[in-house]
Amino acid sequence: MQHELAQTIPELILWTKEREFSLSLSSDRLAFLLAIALYNNERTDGELLESDLQDIFRHVSNAFEQSEATQTQRANNAINDLVKQRFLNRFSSEFTEGLAIYRLTPLGVGVSEYYIRQREFSTLRLSIQLSIVADEIQRASNAAEEGGDERFWRNQVFAPLKFSVAEIFDSIDLSQRMMDENQQQIRERIAMLLSQNWHEAIATCQQLLDETSGNLRELQDVLNASGDKLQSQLLRIQSCLIGRDDLDFVDQLIVNLQNKLDRIISWGQQAIDLWIGYDRHVHKFIRTAIDMDKNRVFGQRLRQSIQDYFESPWQLYIAKAEPLLDLRDDETELNEAEAVGELPTELEYESLTQVQEQIIATMQAHLAPFREQGKPIDLGAILREQLAMYPLSRHFDVARIIVDQAVKLGMASQDSQAIYPEWQSINDNGAEVQANVIDQYNK
């Protein structure tokens, strides 16, 4: 009876220690390895001569603007380094007269594949992968229902699930992680655009947001369409294992595949939700920037566009909502005195304008020193401090005025970096605020 190989963490650590594995690839070394892999894919024999590697290194050296005087020596060092780190295997014998033959190792193929191929993740590729998985699982489930001895299960069920389905799941998982990295790069690019020239970058940012959101949704639709069918086929195989204690290794594999599939689908949806949150955060930042701009930039752009209209014509689109039907009856207007009656002195109306003017004057006097001294404004702390001085009935108006006055003074640098602030309690009745510290003041 064969036993499924299993490695524990201590075994893997010992295995790595015994073989003295060590990886270190600078940018030029990595570029050299990727160039070798790409060149190797175009060859039918998969073998490389040292002269081939020298030529490839010359292209890399020129791209990195390195000295030509030491090119041969640096090429030899780079080749030896890749051999030492087990990215390349070197073969030589007395028949080759000192001319070595090189082949990429599995590690070299894996690293280069990661950088070159995994970026080709697309809906078409995902559909093909899931189609292959569905066929393999279908054949395995049919074989499981036929039944047989342990050898039959290993060859007809375990083998295709282990060496085809599981590897494709791992490939999809790796592709998702590549998309995570791509999203992070897009976030950094958007942050850079908004911090440099946000009013010119709005269209570019919107395009990046829409493209990424569309790609995530399209890929998730493909996963959702296939996920339930794949899970049902795995359950079908699992039902055939009832009462077969000798097939525990197959049952464990099925559980692992179910977990992988659940993780892939779950993370795909979670990635969409996180991106939607980021999308809203960027739009909130842009709206805040527009509100604080006081129409200076957009006014200048509009005037310039009108002046240059004949040289660069443009179109103006106007969106107008349909007017709502007025259902009120003007003839049945109520007399205020009849409808309300006479109010007690305690309930007499106090002009909201007067209240607002008093609060605005107080807040301006309170916030001005922060700008003059360059101190950051923590809205959460200020709101807690000020609301404690007012009755609960005025908390909303006071909080709104404080926020309006604060954002007129400046903005938070963390907003442009898409950093989500924590919710802070601002009174004893459950009111909370979410705001980064304002640390950049308008000139």
UniProtKB/Swiss-Prot annotation:
| Keyword set includes Metal-binding | no
What domain of life does the native source organism fall in? Answer: Bacteria
User: What are the start and end residues of every segment in region (Leucine-zipper)?
Assistant: 209-237
Per UniProt, the keywords (alphabetical) are: Calcium, Cell cycle, Cell division, Chromosome partition, Cytoplasm, DNA condensation
Metal-binding recorded as keyword = no
Q: Which GO terms describe its biological process?
A: cell division; chromosome condensation; chromosome segregation; DNA replication
What is a GO molecular function of this protein? calcium ion binding
Against Pfam families, the record matches this protein to: KicB, MukF_C, MukF_M
GO terms for cellular component: cytoplasm; nucleoid
Spell out the subcellular localization from the entry: Cytoplasm, Nucleoid
Q: Which family does it belong to?
A: Belongs to the MukF family.
- Which HAMAP family does the entry mention? MukF (MF_01803)
Q: What does this protein do?
A: Involved in chromosome condensation, segregation and cell cycle progression. May participate in facilitating chromosome segregation by condensation DNA from both sides of a centrally located replisome during cell division. Not required for mini-F plasmid partitioning. Probably acts via its interaction with MukB and MukE. Overexpression results in anucleate cells. It has a calcium binding activity.
Assembly and partners are described as: Interacts, and probably forms a ternary complex, with MukE and MukB via its C-terminal region. The complex formation is stimulated by calcium or magnesium. It is required for an interaction between MukE and MukB.
Name of this chain's protein: Chromosome partition protein MukF
> In which organism is this protein found?
Glaesserella parasuis serovar 5 (strain SH0165) (Haemophilus parasuis)
The protein's gene is named: mukF
